Design a protein with these regions (language model features):
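N-terminal signal peptide c-region/cleavage motif recognized by signal peptidases
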Residues: 31-33
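Helix-turn-helix repeat elements of alpha-solenoid scaffolds
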Residues: 40-52, 84-93, 126-135, 173-190, ...
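TPR/Sel1-like alpha-solenoid repeat signature
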Residues: 70-78, 90, 112-120, 132, ...
Length: 420
């Protein structure tokens, strides 16, 4: 076998490092050029809005109905440049024009109020942000009534807000946002059940949203426990608290399960619903059971989904898509990205292929790198194992039975400085 020699091997590794460094610098340069062009375009857009506003005010007055849209666009342009104080002033001016022209409780204020809420949140003014959203909510109640189906998107936006704040807070502080989100989800569920037909196109999405929220709450309780009130308590024993947390977690399992069953019912009632669509949401319910340790119920649910696929135009293709290989189970509500402008990092584009064994119960083990040329530090491997060991997978299903299977996934290296 050819032996490169120690000095040649070191030189080869050094050259690879130089090449990687050069490529990284090129990516940085392209990013900076692109960012500079975007910033110039944003500045030009702002100037265009300001000129249009001046012209319109000069011709039609300071409260022309056309001005509010221009102020909304101006505010969004300022926000895209993170010039939040200017954005806030533009949104508030646009809202004032709407109120003067259409009344204090006009629905046309809603996009301005939600934009104000987003901007106040970006400025760190969470109380003012929530106040703006509550104003939008009360205006909708005034116009529609508290249980009208048109309230569902409004409630959903409030849940979004609380979940974004939850992800920014320490667990103990953020729990109050989960409590508020659950109350809102209960209101949403009531409206969906009582006032909206099952064939409502957005119904499955909103019911799934409720399930996702209950997973977040149950997961929070599992990881951090329930907050204990200071002062008088009936019992402070560890066993008592654990029993309480188990009961609470089961409550959220049950409510999430109920919501997913509604997803199934609503999906069946949708126009042009296919067997694959129905099997897909039934499989999601199986995933839910598996996440909460209900393995037998999960298998029965997967089997039902598999039976539904017998009615599909291409049953084997559909089976391969849903059950041909393990799939990581994902429930929850993630933080919405406020700023999509990012600089490339040296680690960002580096990923590795990881092979693992997925058991019949969806548990991952036996991790190793599928590509021999890839490498991870001990700490990176520790983080990898911790990440995938904390996940559950939908198992491979063959002839309606779960099977142990090898699974290969792409895994992004953790950011530098992340500790296990």
């Amino acid at each position: 076998m050819y032996n490169m020699g120690t000095s040649n091997l070191l030189a080869y590794r050094h050259s690879l490092t130089m090449i990687k460094g050069f490529l990284f610098l090129v990516l940085m340069l392209f990013s900076l050029i692109s960012r500079g062009q975007v910033e110039q375009d944003q500045t030009d857009t702002i100037e265009s809005y300001l000129i249009a506003i001046d012209d319109l005010e000069a011709e039609y007055g300071a409260y022309s109905t056309q001005l509010s849209d221009l102020y909304l666009g101006l505010g969004k342009s300022y926000a895209s440049k993170t010039e939040y104080f200017d954005a806030l002033a533009a949104f508030q001016r646009g809202m004032q024009i709407e109120r003067v022209n259409f009344g204090l409780h006009s629905l046309s204020q809603t996009p301005y109020l939600t934009s104000i809420a987003d901007t106040e949140s970006n400025l760190g003014n969470q109380e003012k942000s929530l106040k703006a959203l509550n104003q939008a909510y009360q205006i909708s109640v005034k116009n529609y009534g508290g249980t009208d189906k048109r309230m569902v998107p409004v409630i959903n936006s409030l849940i979004d807000w609380h979940m974004n704040i939850y992800h920014q807070q320490r667990p103990k502080v953020g729990y109050s946002n989960l409590v508020m989100s659950e109350r809102l989800a209960d209101d949403m569920s009531f409206i969906l059940d009582e006032n909206i037909a099952l064939n409502y196109p957005e119904g499955p999405t909103y019911y799934r949203r409720i399930a996702d929220l209950h997973f977040v709450i149950a997961n929070h309780i599992t990881k951090h426990g329930e907050p204990r009130e200071t002062g008088f308590t009936v019992s402070s024993g560890l066993d008592s608290r654990r029993r309480s947390e188990v009961r609470t977690s089961y409550r959220h399992f049950h409510r999430g399960k109920t919501a997913l069953e509604k997803v199934i019912q609503a999906s069946i009632e949708q126009e042009n619903s296919t067997p694959y669509d129905q099997a897909n949401v039934i499989a999601d319910l199986g995933d839910w059971h598996l996440l909460f340790g209900q393995k037998l119920s999960a298998i029965k649910t997967y089997q039902l989904a598999d039976e539904i696929l017998d009615l599909d135009e291409n049953p084997e293709t559909a089976r391969q898509s849903l059950f041909g290989s393990p799939k990581i189970i994902e429930f929850g509500i993630k933080k919405q990205n406020q700023d999509t402008t990012t600089m490339p990092s040296e680690n960002e584009s580096m990923s590795v292929q990881v092979s693992m064994l997925i058991s019949e119960g969806g548990v991952a083990s036996d991790f190793y790198l599928a590509n021999e040329s890839d490498s991870l530090t001990d700490n990176e491997m520790k983080l990898l194992k911790k990440y995938f060991s904390g996940k559950r997978f939908r198992p491979r299903i063959v002839e309606r039975q779960p099977q142990e299977a090898t699974h290969i996934v792409n895994y992004d290296r953790p950011a530098k400085g992340v500790e296990g």
